[in-house]
Amino acid sequence: MENRWQVMIVWQVDRMRIRTWKSLVKHHMYVSKKAKGWFYRHHYESTHPRISSEVHIPLGDATLVVTTYWGLHTGEREWHLGQGASIEWRKKRYSTQVDPGLADQLIHTYYFDCFSESAIRNAILGNIVSPRCEYPAGHNKVGSLQYLALAALIKPKKIKPPLPSVTKLTEDRWNKPQKTKGHRGSHTMNGH
């Protein structure tokens, strides 16, 4: 029988971002307790030699698993050091990979206080609402005019240390194409 290959998306990430991600996850799991229910699996708890860590984030009856890797083949640049991350959504026997933006949105539907559009309705009804969003990485669209006005009124409070964002983990110089000036002044286009 021949070898069977399984292809999966792994975002190339430098090791310092992975270290930051791991320490933020551990801080919010054990110190601030904002990541309640999250499970951190160390490299020595995995049977796969390339896995450096796994973070299991319960989302209702599903789970989001952020896996970091080491010892991967390097890319074409010298700073592609063989580190990476993959993001997988699992429910029972079904699993699929998700992109970092969707992962942050999924996390935000279950974790971290938010002043969202539903909060405007609750405030009008006289209910007490959270005055700010702790996890802006979980929003990828522009809010309503009411939301933008209230958000401008209440300045976001910087959380030290920041909450762990999957988008921040995977964004880097080789995952986001560099913006360059076009031939018409300041218009931008993707450069290669």
From Swiss-Prot:
<keyword id="KW-0479">Metal-binding</keyword>
<feature type="binding site">
    <location>
        <position position="114"/>
    </location>
    <ligand>
        <name>Zn(2+)</name>
    </ligand>
</feature>
<feature type="modified residue" description="Phosphothreonine; by host MAP4K1">
    <location>
        <position position="96"/>
    </location>
</feature>
<keyword id="KW-0694">RNA-binding</keyword>
<feature type="short sequence motif" description="BC-box-like motif">
    <location>
        <begin position="144"/>
        <end position="153"/>
    </location>
</feature>
<keyword id="KW-1035">Host cytoplasm</keyword>
<keyword id="KW-1032">Host cell membrane</keyword>
<keyword id="KW-0597">Phosphoprotein</keyword>
<dbReference type="InterPro" id="IPR000475">
    <property type="entry name" value="Vif"/>
</dbReference>
<keyword id="KW-0862">Zinc</keyword>
<keyword id="KW-0472">Membrane</keyword>
<dbReference type="GO" id="GO:0030430">
    <property type="term" value="C:host cell cytoplasm"/>
</dbReference>
<keyword id="KW-0014">AIDS</keyword>
<keyword id="KW-0946">Virion</keyword>
<comment type="similarity">
    <text>Belongs to the primate lentivirus group Vif protein family.</text>
</comment>
<dbReference type="GO" id="GO:0046872">
    <property type="term" value="F:metal ion binding"/>
</dbReference>
<feature type="region of interest" description="SOCS box-like">
    <location>
        <begin position="151"/>
        <end position="180"/>
    </location>
</feature>
<feature type="region of interest" description="Disordered">
    <location>
        <begin position="164"/>
        <end position="192"/>
    </location>
</feature>
<keyword id="KW-0945">Host-virus interaction</keyword>
<protein>
    <recommendedName>
        <fullName>Virion infectivity factor</fullName>
    </recommendedName>
</protein>
<dbReference type="Pfam" id="PF00559">
    <property type="entry name" value="Vif"/>
</dbReference>
<feature type="binding site">
    <location>
        <position position="108"/>
    </location>
    <ligand>
        <name>Zn(2+)</name>
    </ligand>
</feature>
<feature type="site" description="Cleavage in virion (by viral protease)">
    <location>
        <begin position="150"/>
        <end position="151"/>
    </location>
</feature>
<feature type="modified residue" description="Phosphoserine; by host">
    <location>
        <position position="144"/>
    </location>
</feature>
<dbReference type="GO" id="GO:0016020">
    <property type="term" value="C:membrane"/>
</dbReference>
<feature type="region of interest" description="Interaction with host APOBEC3F; F2-box">
    <location>
        <begin position="74"/>
        <end position="79"/>
    </location>
</feature>
<feature type="region of interest" description="Interaction with host APOBEC3F; F1-box">
    <location>
        <begin position="14"/>
        <end position="17"/>
    </location>
</feature>
<feature type="short sequence motif" description="HCCH motif">
    <location>
        <begin position="108"/>
        <end position="139"/>
    </location>
</feature>
<comment type="function">
    <text>Counteracts the innate antiviral activity of host APOBEC3F and APOBEC3G by promoting their ubiquitination and degradation. Acts as a substrate recognition component of an E3 ubiquitin-protein ligase complex: mechanistically, Vif hijacks a host cullin-5-RING E3 ubiquitin-protein ligase complex (ECS complex) and the transcription coactivator CBFB/CBF-beta to form an active E3 ubiquitin-protein ligase complex that targets APOBEC3G and APOBEC3F for polyubiquitination, leading to their degradation by the proteasome.</text>
</comment>
<feature type="modified residue" description="Phosphoserine; by host MAP4K1">
    <location>
        <position position="165"/>
    </location>
</feature>
<keyword id="KW-1043">Host membrane</keyword>
<feature type="region of interest" description="Interaction with host APOBEC3G; G-box">
    <location>
        <begin position="40"/>
        <end position="44"/>
    </location>
</feature>
<feature type="modified residue" description="Phosphothreonine; by host">
    <location>
        <position position="188"/>
    </location>
</feature>
<dbReference type="GO" id="GO:0044423">
    <property type="term" value="C:virion component"/>
</dbReference>
<keyword id="KW-0832">Ubl conjugation</keyword>
<comment type="subunit">
    <text>Homomultimer; in vitro and presumably in vivo. Interacts with viral RNA and Pr55Gag precursor; these interactions mediate Vif incorporation into the virion. Interacts with the viral reverse transcriptase. Forms cullin-5-RING E3 ubiquitin-protein ligase complex (ECS complex) by interacting with host CUL5, RBX2, elongin BC complex (ELOB and ELOC) and CBFB/CBF-beta. Within the ECS complex, Vif interacts directly with host CUL5, ELOC and APOBEC (APOBEC3F and APOBEC3G) substrates.</text>
</comment>
<feature type="region of interest" description="Interaction with host APOBEC3F and APOBEC3G; FG-box">
    <location>
        <begin position="54"/>
        <end position="72"/>
    </location>
</feature>
<dbReference type="GO" id="GO:0020002">
    <property type="term" value="C:host cell plasma membrane"/>
</dbReference>
<feature type="region of interest" description="Multimerization">
    <location>
        <begin position="151"/>
        <end position="164"/>
    </location>
</feature>
<dbReference type="GO" id="GO:0019058">
    <property type="term" value="P:viral life cycle"/>
</dbReference>
<dbReference type="GO" id="GO:0003723">
    <property type="term" value="F:RNA binding"/>
</dbReference>
<feature type="region of interest" description="Membrane association">
    <location>
        <begin position="171"/>
        <end position="172"/>
    </location>
</feature>
